[in-house]
Each structure stands twice: as C-alpha cells, then as structure tokens.
C-alpha cells in the first residue's frame, strides 16, 4: 500500500527527499565560496578549551606558565585534562615546549564572545595554520560560514579580524565553522589577495574595476540578504 514517488536528482546532489529545483539554474550561476577564496580552513580546535582558553588574559598566562613548566599537581592535571585522549597526545606535544608570551592571542570564541587563547600551533589539536598564519598579528579580514547546515534557516555568516574557534558560528556538530581570509601574507611581509583572479575578472567584466575589499563586502552583504537566503 506504499505510494512510491520517483525523486529527481542530479550531480552533485543526491537527496533522498523531494526537493524543488526550480531555482537551481539561477542559483548555479553564482560562484561557490570555496572557489572565490583560494585558501580556507576550519576554525581552531584545542581539544582542551578549559586549559588553553580563558576570559582573563592574566589567568590564562598563569595557567600556561604552570603547564609548560611542569609545575602542576594531580588536581591541576585532572581539572584541565592534561592527559592523552584518542589521537591527541598532549603529553608528547608538551615535551620541549616552553612558554612564549606571543602565543597569547585574542580569539572570537563564539559570536560576540571574545576571549584569550594560548595559541601554540604545536600544542593544540587543530591549529588551522593554513589560514591563521595569515590572520594572527596581521591586518586582515576573514569571512566565516559553515559548509553544511543541520538546523534552522541559513544565517551562518559572520566575519573576523582575529582567531576563531571551530564552533564560533555554530555549536552544532555538523556545522563546523570555516574561515576564508581576504589576504595571504608572505615571509617578507608582503601580501596578496586570496581571491580567485579568474572570478574577479568575470565580475569586473560586469561592474568594472573593483578592489578585494569591494568583493568581500559584496559577498558579505549578499549572504545577509533576505532575498538570497529565501
């Protein structure tokens, strides 16, 4: 007695529920966000937020000093989980590491929630250096969004000038936050745009000469547009 319904599908979408693809042709005329920006990465993940992140800079500094000096007791070890778990071998990472004040950096932990992180890429689980080496102590902007959505209507867009956590945009497990920096920095201190210049050229054919900031602002505005979101 089951009434079957044949589903329409095409690459790269293979939904197992009915979908309305009427607007898909118009939607596909746009550019994919990870095609517009050449370099991107998920936000930083420490695996030990209570150890490496704090609201107070001085408190974090004291805790990091204690951790890296090895001058801590069993209570400290249990409270801050100074233990190995899964593939994250903290004890191994701590070997031969010394405290460096330059690793204390501001982080946008959640939306409008700014904290401090001891950002030693050799210590935390997933530092996201691919992106954050272009942001930490640099003049830059990064677009924040999620690659997939598992909850309510699309509103997963923000921006940052500093480090972000993997859950800055959303705390849902499936909604990992990604950062797309506007500029890439080189060892000599120079920088270049992180935008795909072929796509920039296509845009300039329509609107004329634009700056990287113009395109960044436009993308951010469109992603906030009610018409686009609907």
Question: Which residue ranges define each predicted feature?
Answer:
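Sequence-level detector for compositionally biased, low-complexity segments
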Residues: 1-230
């Amino acid at each position: 007695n089951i009434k079957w319904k044949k589903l329409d599908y095409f690459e790269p979408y293979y939904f197992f529920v009915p979908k309305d693809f009427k607007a898909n042709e118009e939607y596909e005329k746009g550019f994919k966000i990870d095609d517009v920006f050449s370099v991107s990465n998920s936000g930083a993940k420490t695996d030990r937020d209570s150890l490496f992140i704090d609201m107070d800079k001085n408190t974090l500094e004291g805790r990091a000093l204690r951790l890296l000096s090895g001058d801590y007791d069993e209570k400290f070890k249990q409270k801050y989980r100074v233990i190995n778990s899964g593939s994250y071998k903290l004890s191994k990472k701590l070997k031969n590491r010394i405290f460096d004040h330059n690793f204390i950096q501001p982080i946008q932990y959640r939306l409008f929630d700014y904290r401090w992180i001891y950002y030693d890429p050799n210590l935390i689980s997933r530092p996201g250096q691919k992106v954050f080496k272009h942001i930490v102590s640099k003049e830059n902007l990064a677009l924040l969004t999620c690659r997939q959505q598992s909850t309510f209507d699309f509103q997963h867009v923000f921006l940052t000038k500093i480090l972000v956590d993997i859950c800055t945009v959303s705390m849902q497990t499936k909604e990992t936050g990604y950062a797309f920096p506007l500029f890439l920095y080189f060892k000599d201190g120079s920088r270049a745009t992180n935008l795909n210049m072929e796509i920039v050229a296509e845009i300039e054919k329509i609107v004329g000469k634009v700056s990287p900031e113009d395109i960044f602002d436009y993308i951010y505005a469109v992603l906030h547009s009610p018409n686009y979101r609907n």
